[in-house]
Amino acid sequence: VTLFLALNWLAVGHAEELKPAAWSSAPEALQKCEELETARKWGEAIQLYEKALESFAGDQSLKYGLRRARIHHAVERRYGDLSFQGMLNDSGRTQLLNMFEDVYRSVQREYLESVSLTRFLAHGTESLYMALKNPVFIEKNFPDPAARQSRINSVRQTLISTYWNRPVSGVAETRQVLGSVCDLCRRELNLKDSAVLLEYVFGGCNALDEYSVLLTPDRYRELHGTIQGEMVGLGIEMKAEAGRGMHLLNVLLGSPAEEGGLRPDDYITDINSTDCRNLSTDDAAKLLRGSAGSAVRLSWISPDNQKHSGEFTRRRVDIHSITRRTMLDRQRGIGYIRMEGFQEDTVQELDAALRSLEAEGLQALVLDLRGNPGGLLDTAAAVAERFIGSGVVVSTRGRNQNQNQVYRVTGTYTRPYPLALIVDGDSASASEIIAGAVRDHNRGVIVGRPTYGKWSVQTIVRMPGEREMALRLTTAKFYSPDDRNYSGVGLQPDVLVPDATQTRTTFFRTRTPDEINADPDVAEAISALQQRLSRN
């Protein structure tokens, strides 16, 4: 399965909204970031480091701090994963040495660039070094951490003096080095082999780009469900806001959450009698997880400060790509479609929405891709065919020949009406494929803000063995029909709209057409279409 996923599966918290100009120097920015690290607010630290690097791109301390925060965040996320805990408890040395070898071989075979075994091993050593200072790792693996602190410090120093960037000539030598590290940690710390080797297995992937990662069984199942457009749970997207609780960014249509009265912009304050106003996103998510048919009781506050509570039963939730379709200007026949993902059934949903609007007199379309993180490559090409008459819509190029593909459309399903595309900084991957095709084919006007800038392809590589594990690897870059790649910069819109007041697009499914029209991005899109229609 080939994916375009804009974000790297970090459930980050809500960072303080600081503009780059808020820092007068890199050391000042570093201090603010390290304060968040000290408070173990890894997600917020990651966001703040990224923002600081926009101003001080070459600062090595900020770059290292970002890597450190990402490693700690990954360690704590793994240890909050039940499937990872199962691996920790029942995996032996030989099994995990084989897993390390399998992961590396898959990386060498599929990844966009060649990665040396020495580099892969070195990043595993760094992950173990960081983990030995992580409170969650220490609490899980050491019953009496205070009594062992001096030994922990000694082992960390040995990792630097003996194993840091240690060159290896092949798999056999690598297994010897890993065995030696296991022996050291068992002798000095009574740390079991699985805790050591799993840091190497998962941490080795830190040598890759930020979109490449080894997925635990639970995360692989979650990803598979997202691709298929289904999940088990309540059907919410949330971010922690310190002191306020879990801010609901989205509530899925037809989900237990929506049916029980939860709405975007509500704040969950209590989960099964646990106050979550100061929990991290990940910690709150652990409390919300459960099997289909199980119940959870929530308390929440709505935007009008009204308090609510209720019991919700977890079940399978279908994730829809098209979350709103409506006519915005019936006189001129201007319709609106909101698309939030590119999944297996997205094209069928889009076709149904288009047929419905066409029955109402559709003459021009506003396609809203704001906040759309992407999805499946084949789906993106099929969506593009609904609007591009013929020719290339996207091409991919990778290290392996099978990653070099050109996606063409024939115009069989093309709609000829004028198009306005709305994008923003969270429109990524597959959304950027559509934007690139619309731009290069001169098919419509693009409105909003620069796109995310993730122009790479990720492939899911299933790992051997009984456990349902997989690698998500960057295997290629993609290019617009005119052979442009906007990685790191994003595609600029034709009509730039300042992002002064962010309108939450998930609200649009319950707003009237007049309320949608009042959104600045939509208003600009309608204006462009009206001008186009008046010329016809």
Report the location of each language-model feature.
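Terminal targeting/pro-maturation regions of precursor/exported proteins
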Residues: 16-212
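Structured segments of extracytoplasmic/periplasmic soluble domains
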Residues: 51-55, 102, 106-114, 123, ...
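Conserved functional hotspot residues or short segments at active or partner-binding sites
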Residues: 470, 479-536
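Cleft-lining beta-strand/loop regions that shape enzyme active-site pockets
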Residues: 34-39, 53, 187-193, 215-218, ...
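PDZ/PDZ-like domain segments forming the peptide/carboxylate-binding groove
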Residues: 89, 93, 109-110, 130, ...
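Signal peptide processing junction and immediate N-terminal pro/mature segment
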Residues: 9-17
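PDZ/PDZ-like peptide-tail recognition elements
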Residues: 123, 194, 199-202, 208-250
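Bacterial N-terminal signal peptides
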Residues: 1-8
